């Protein structure tokens, strides 16, 4: 996915050279957290039967963002005429899989246990391979532009669901 995204980014940057009076914004988002889609349904599938389970070793960083913050960030970027270029839309505090699962389990009263990888793969399919990757992403440019997140970390994001 990242390779495809980078190829698209290069294409947009080429277009920007042809249209110098046009403001281009590329928003890279983390996994959205809300009740209906994004990362939440995957976590719900993995944590069936009242058991919380992490994916991978639990130390990998997972870029997440509350859907409300993501929507506000896009609005901010499109309405602030000084914003252009590439922006990461992720929570300002990096979250590990362990932190996400702990917050999820604590919020929904689940017991944390290890679940065998084949069972998790059966529940979520190929999404497991994406969630096993370590991806440390911060929204530095977005914050420096003046954007303020309502939900800053995994606990705040998941508690708001």
Report the location of each language-model feature.
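Mid/C-terminal beta-alpha module of Rossmann-like enzyme folds, strongest
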Residues: 80-126
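Residue-level signal for the nucleotide or nucleotide-sugar donor/cofactor binding architecture
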Residues: 34, 62-68, 95, 137, ...
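C-terminal amphipathic/interface module of NAD(P)-dependent oxidoreductases
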Residues: 110, 129-161
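Alpha-helical membrane-targeting segments
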Residues: 42-63, 106-136
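NAD(P)-dependent short-chain dehydrogenase/reductase
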Residues: 7-16, 23-26, 30-61
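Hydrophobic "lid"/C-terminal helical patch
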Residues: 74-78, 104, 158-161
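Non-catalytic, hydrophobic alpha-helical segments
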Residues: 70, 74, 89, 100, ...
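Alpha-helical substrate-binding/gating segment
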Residues: 44-53, 59-89, 94
